[in-house]
UniProtKB/Swiss-Prot annotation:
SUPFAM superfamilies reported for this sequence: Arginase/deacetylase
Required cofactor names: Mn(2+)
Protein name: Formimidoylglutamase
Keyword Lipid biosynthesis found: no
Pfam annotation, one family: Arginase
Domain of life (superkingdom): Bacteria
HAMAP family: Formimidoylglutam
GO-annotated biological processes: L-histidine catabolic process to glutamate and formamide; L-histidine catabolic process to glutamate and formate; putrescine biosynthetic process from arginine, via agmatine
Residues reported to bind Mn(2+) 2: 155, 157, 242, 244
Pathway given in the UniProt record: Amino-acid degradation; L-histidine degradation into L-glutamate; L-glutamate from N-formimidoyl-L-glutamate (hydrolase route): step 1/1
Amino acid sequence: MYTQGNPKLWTGRLDSETDPKQFRHFQTVKFANLENMENVSDKTGVGLLGYAVDKGVENNKGRIGSRKGPDIIKHEFAKLPDLSECEMLIDYGNVEHTSNHLRETQQEMARLSAKVIKQHKQAFLIGGGHDIAYAQYLATREVYSDASIGIINIDAHFDTRPDEPPTSGTMFREILDNDENVDYLVLGLAQGGNTRALYDYAKDNNIIYVYADELLHQVSPTIKDKIERFIHDHDTIMFTICMDVIDSAFAPGVSSPSVLGLYPHSVFEISKRVILSDKVSSISIAETNPDYDVDNRTSKLAANLIHHFLV
C-alpha cells in the first residue's frame, strides 16, 4: 500500500526563515503523490521513497522492526543542513506491506520507484528490509530495459540464498538466475556470515566480492580500480547499502548486527567512488531497525549517508 509523505517528520532546528544559507532539509523539502506524477523529459533534483516493510526480514528469521526505518531516517535527515543547493527535494512517502505476499509489495514498490528514477537525478529508496533491492532491480530494468546492469552492494552478506518464499536474503539470486545482463559486486563481505554453498554460487555466477577486512583502514588502489572498472563495464549502476555491513559499535540498530563490520568512514569512502558516476540510477539503504538502535545512532548514520551523497 502506498502512503504519501508525512510533513510531521520534517522538523528541526530553525536558524533562519529567510536566509537559504542557514536552511536545513526540513525547510526545503516538498511533498508529492507518485500516483499523480506525469512523465518528464529532464531529470532534476532528488526523490525519496520509503519501503516500510520488514516481511522479508521476518521470512529470513531476522529481527523485525526495520519497517520503521524510513520514517526515522527521514526525520534525522530533515535536521541536517542544506549544503548541496539541491534544486528539488521531494518526499514521496512510503510503500507498506498490506498484501498477502511479499512479492506483491515488491512489485508495487518497483512500479513507484521507476517513476522516481525517471523523474530525478538521484532516487533514494529507503528501507525497510534489504528485499527492497529486488524492487529496486525491477524498477531499474523497467527504466533501462536493454541496459547491462551492474549491482554494487555494500553488505556483509551475499544475499543469494535459494529459499522460498522470498526473503531479505534471496533477492540477488533471484535477479542473477533470471537476468543474464546483470553482474554483481559485493563490498564488505563478512567471512563469518556466508556458507560454503553461497561461495560456490558466487564462483559459478562470477560474483565479484571484497572482504570487510580488506576495507577496514584505507581503500586500496586495487579495490578502487576494481570498483571503477565494474562501473565502466556496465550501462547503468544499481547501488545498494545494507546497514548491517557497518560494525555494531556504530550501527547497533540493524536486523543482523556485525561484530567485525566496517567503519562508517570506509563506507563513505567506497560510496563516494560509486556516487560520482552518472551511471548510478538509484541508491537504496536497507536494514535500519529502530527497535534495536541506541540514541538513534544507526538512523542518524543512514541519514548522513543520504546527506553526503547529494550532488
